Structure formats: C-alpha cells, structure tokens
C-alpha cells in the first residue's frame, strides 16, 4: 500500500515499474488521449515523461494505488488518428538484464496498425537495445493496446515508475 504522506526526492530512483495500456475515443485529440489514460489507470496522475531506462533491481508489479495528482515518472507511447475506421496501436516493453546490477530498458512504439505488429516491434526494439550494449536479456515483458477509430481515437501504452 502506497502512503499518501510518503515523500521521495526527485533524485531517488523509483523501485517499481508497472506496465499499463488503454484506448480512448472522443470528439478531439486531447480528450481521446485523456480517455486512454483513464482506461489505463493513470488518468488522474501528472505524468513526467522520461527516457527509457528502468532503474536496476526495480520490481515489475501491477499498478499500485498512487495518490491522485502525484508526479509519476513515465515512459509512454501513443497514437492518435482522426480517420474513422483506422486502427491505431501503442506498445511498451521492458527488457530485464541477467546481471541485476545493470539497468533495464523500456521501449515504446506506436503505429497505424494492429496490436500484434506493435508488440512484436517494441519487443524487437528492446532486444536491439541490449545488443547495442552487449548485455544479456533475462526477460522481456510487454503490453500493447489497439483501437479502431470511431470519431477521434487514441491507443496508449506506458511504463509508470513508482516506489514501494
């Protein structure tokens, strides 16, 4: 259970990571994006967009109850379309190293297309990132969302970092 009174230094590395995804459709792009955040469970948080590094030894957990309005470090991808009938997708992957002293990699990807294509691509991006570093992968975890546009649609996927 996260305590609302817990205060963390902005320089303290988070020690948990949660993968979430959602979709939304609305009358304008911002509300479609907001609906996708709400459906992913992080719509009432202040997301601070980060680059794609998972702190060493961070645990991957289901999304905890985070106090509304909290500043949450988040890596995310999203795709918005205004073309009715078009399919959009967004995915996120986390590659965990065999050497637990090393950081992990978070990769995000979005596309006009389906969930499988998106998730396959984002997993391959994580593999390539590890190859570039010369590191061995222990595990890759991923999630993706897909949405067929009715009005203005958004697919969203994120890795939200937080504290135990």
From Swiss-Prot:
Source organism superkingdom: Archaea
Keywords for the protein's UniProt record, in alphabetical order: Decarboxylase, Lyase, Pyruvate
Enzymatic class: lyase
Cofactor binding, per record: Binds 1 pyruvoyl group covalently per subunit.
EC number annotated for this UniProt entry: 4.1.1.19
GO BP annotation list: arginine catabolic process
One Pfam family this sequence matches: PvlArgDC
Residues modified as Pyruvic acid (Ser): 52
GO molecular function, one term: arginine decarboxylase activity
Gene3D superfamilies, per the entry: 3.30.60.30, Pyruvoyl-Dependent Histidine Decarboxylase, subunit B
InterPro entries reported in the protein's UniProt record: Pyr-dep_his/arg-deCO2ase, Pyr-dep_his/arg-deCO2ase_sand, Pyruvoyl-dep_arg_deCO2ase
Site (described: Cleavage (non-hydrolytic)): 51-52
Catalytic activity field: L-arginine + H(+) = agmatine + CO2
Cross-referenced PANTHER family: PYRUVOYL-DEPENDENT ARGININE DECARBOXYLASE (PTHR40438:SF1)
Family per similarity comment: Belongs to the PdaD family.
HAMAP family for the chain: PvlArgDC
Protein name, entry field: Pyruvoyl-dependent arginine decarboxylase
Protein species of origin: Methanococcus maripaludis (strain DSM 14266 / JCM 13030 / NBRC 101832 / S2 / LL)
Protein encoded by which gene: pdaD
